[in-house]
Amino acid sequence: MAPNLRKSHPLLKMINNSLIDLPTPSNISAWWNFGSLLGICLMTQILTGLLLAMHYTADTTLAFSSVAHTCRNVQYGWLIRNLHANGASFFFICIYLHIGRGFYYGSYLYKETWNTGIILLLTLMATAFVGYVLPWGQMSFWGATVITNLFSAIPYIGQTLVEWAWGGFSVDNPTLTRFFALHFLLPFAIAGLTLIHLTFLHESGSNNPLGIVSNCDKIPFHPYFTLKDILGFTLMVLPLTSLALFSPNLLGDPENFTPANPLVTPPHIKPEWYFLFAYAILRSIPNKLGGVLALAASVLVLFLSPFLHKAKQRTMTFRPLSQLLFWILVTNLFILTWVGSQPVEHPFIIIGQLASITYFTILLILFPIIGTLENKMLNF
């Protein structure tokens, strides 16, 4: 009998083991769709980004005009740009839901997969930040100035580090050029990290909503989950195209329609919506270094999740107290996001400070305590 090429060819064999014959738990829900959606997002962003880069000029005098030219004069340039800008928002929606799923169902106990995932998140955040600077509008310029300036809070080497990042003594042409280079490079680094992420995942196999070993009940990835992923893809593309076609500037800042001007500061400098929770935590501490440390901790705290898991059960499916705490955490993140978009004045300052304290308290103190308490409740 002739060998099956899909199972014998060195390259096709890898694809087969990852996407076709992969044994998958039969009970994984739609929350497991977001990994494949993130892959689709990445491919879409790389494709639209490549097309945009063909018409973009990384020069302070021409950047803003080149983006306007792309939207006005390039065939479907407006659509490519709108898909790219709003695609970033969908990328973050998917990654936050993906992390939330991992947190709820205890997927962080696959330590290597979880850690590479956090590195992926950090790389994505860096990519989105440098990308936001490229149109060289007011918010691009001042966002770049404010965020890069945070590195000056690092003792001893801070100021040198900032000037090295800027390529001068302020955000100017060298900064824009290197940000464009980084924005072009980093998505490919994300693609490479994704392969590492998947390699670690396929070592153990997927987790499932019950958090128990599912070796006795696994089904092939294709056709069952390929079809399910196509449904998820369709359900994501519909709102993305609707947003890009009907309300492309809904999530953007009006300030970015004004070309960058170092002499005029916008009344309220704020990042895109997907960074607002971290920005609110940064602003909640009146000390510069303290704020920077809190900002870093807001994401890096995820590295501690596997070590703070004290419950005997892996997932929160049958842990009502942890569930309650989880949804309080989600609500708290929405509050932080809202506060980050508001001006620095009463009552937003105190709300931001309370929400920041709550965020770290839930993650570092309450989750382990509640996990231990639920273990005791199992004995009753």
UniProtKB/Swiss-Prot annotation:
Residues given in the record as heme b b562 binding sites: H84, H183
Segments crossing the lipid bilayer: 34-54, 78-99, 114-134, 179-199, 227-247, 289-309, 321-341, 348-368
Key words of the record: Electron transport, Heme, Iron, Membrane, Metal-binding, Mitochondrion, Mitochondrion inner membrane, Respiratory chain, Transmembrane, Transmembrane helix, Transport, Ubiquinone
Tree of life domain: Eukaryota
GO function term, MF aspect, one: metal ion binding
One GO CC term on file: respiratory chain complex III
Membrane-related topology note: Multi-pass membrane protein
Further details from the record: Heme 1 (or BL or b562) is low-potential and absorbs at about 562 nm, and heme 2 (or BH or b566) is high-potential and absorbs at about 566 nm.
Main function: Component of the ubiquinol-cytochrome c reductase complex (complex III or cytochrome b-c1 complex) that is part of the mitochondrial respiratory chain. The b-c1 complex mediates electron transfer from ubiquinol to cytochrome c. Contributes to the generation of a proton gradient across the mitochondrial membrane that is then used for ATP synthesis.
Subunit structure of this chain's protein: The cytochrome bc1 complex contains 11 subunits: 3 respiratory subunits (MT-CYB, CYC1 and UQCRFS1), 2 core proteins (UQCRC1 and UQCRC2) and 6 low-molecular weight proteins (UQCRH/QCR6, UQCRB/QCR7, UQCRQ/QCR8, UQCR10/QCR9, UQCR11/QCR10 and a cleavage product of UQCRFS1). This cytochrome bc1 complex then forms a dimer.
Protein name: Cytochrome b
Species whose genome carries this gene: Macronectes halli (Hall's giant petrel)
Source species taxonomy: Eukaryota, Metazoa, Chordata, Craniata, Vertebrata
